Amino acid sequence: MLLYRAGHRALKRLRRDGLRPEDVRVLVGPASGPKWLIFPGVDRVLMEKGFGVPRNGGGHRLLVGSSAGAWRMLAFAARRPLEAYERLIDGYVSQTFPMPVRAKDVTPAYRRMLAEVFTDDDLDAITSHPHADVAIHVTRVFDPYPWSYRAAQIAAIAMGMAVHRLWTG
């Protein structure tokens, strides 16, 4: 079951026409760690029904993601999205790391995985599509003062809430 949150006019239109690919201007893939693995069924349907990158015109779409959500959005924008998506799933679930897991082991492993998942044709499609843009959000934090981490985190959350309130009214 999908829950639609929409204004009165939009809800009336959704009930009349259903949700159509041309109604979607932004597709978001949040950072989720391995939780993204619950989405393959939904993602496949979205790709098959044209909710990924507009292939034959159909407006312009922004695909936004961070972390694993960015990888999903890259697959949506690939030359052959379903094939790239299947390679992404296979590559992700086959990762193994020595214990304890360290960033110095994880980062190169994921770089290798992504290089195997996305072909040169995919990269061309992702970077040059006339009807879609992919935005990847990345944050890298260096915390020289461990005691300040919590304060910085709280400040960032507060700032995000303030921007959200200003943006949505």
Residue ranges of each PLM-predicted region?
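Catalytic nucleophile serine of serine hydrolases
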Residues: 67
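Patatin-like phospholipase
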Residues: 1-62, 74-169
